């Protein structure tokens, strides 16, 4: 006998275009840690590819799922995330508000939505809690027409990402008979550098990619004061890191790469956690230096199903075991896909250099160099909360 189970799809889309007021290991840092663990699982199978994810987006989707889960399904989510969303809803709401605050000066938007099959009966407490904690909107769509349903969802995504990401969800991922709902998270960030890279300084330079081949790529260059530092992994591999603040200074890009060119990026990434990144922020010192960084655009779409299963979140994907009775009691649901599409653009754009920076640019003494000419790790961090909005590796710009 063939059993047919209703299911739902989760999608999270993220976009980037160019100390903490919470406790020492905040809820948002715990959520970001989950995203970092997922990232580590992804790069195991894609060590030489460009990969970009949004830990905050992953935490948001899993948080919405946790609100609708019960039994062992909820326990697995809570164990991996290390907190119960219901118990800390007020704090999560405060964190989400801080991330999108206009005080950031840079543009940050986080949007969540649930797309329901026409006539689907969703439990009222789940809908109310989801709206309160994650500001999640609800829309009805006709999943029996997969092309129309995917078009509606993709239109929402395109609108929330300012037209930069479309075609997230293909019609063939929607089962007209069984799909009941699609959860979507979209994160958009556009930041201007605090200290702008001048276009005339951008020149082609050599970048040694993850495959060992050399490529000539456009490199941004700037002489300014940056906070930077170095440390080593538990097994003694040294690496360097540097902070590039955006003009609002509440958000920064952090870049890390091995000190020795013979050390692969994959050797240091497994040791990176939110606690590690916090330690960078606390130990970096300002230095006048020449920074050389690739100008790049990277886009990646990833199904997070297998990485999450590797971390121990398995039941929600199994039709006979998944428990989402807090979403609906009328039928059994399971998750068929968790998709994330992320895009990052790094260029010269930014605010004009300050007078102090201009003065530094013409100073005569010879500064140290920080040259990013081989595979590197980057993160976009919301400093007041410790939230990691974006995380990625670049093997070839």
Swiss-Prot record:
Q: What molecular function does GO assign, one term?
A: serine-type endopeptidase inhibitor activity
Which Pfam family, just one, is annotated for this protein?
Serpin
Where on the tree of life does the source sit, at the highest rank? Eukaryota
Q: In which tissues is it expressed?
A: Most abundant in seminal vesicles.
Keywords carried by this UniProt record: Developmental protein, Differentiation, Glycoprotein, Heparin-binding, Neurogenesis, Protease inhibitor, Secreted, Serine protease inhibitor, Signal
Q: Which SMART domains match?
A: SERPIN
Q: Which residues are glycosylated?
A: 159
Places the protein is found:
Secreted, Extracellular space
Q: Where is the signal peptide?
A: 1-19
GO terms under cellular component: cytosol; extracellular region; extracellular space; neuromuscular junction; platelet alpha granule
**An example of a Gene Ontology BP annotation on this entry?**
secretory granule organization
Q: Where is this site: Reactive bond?
A: 364-365
* Role played: Serine protease inhibitor with activity toward thrombin, trypsin, and urokinase. Promotes neurite extension by inhibiting thrombin. Binds heparin.
- Give the similarity note: Belongs to the serpin family.
Q: Indicate what this protein is called per its UniProt record.
A: Glia-derived nexin
Specify the species.
Mus musculus
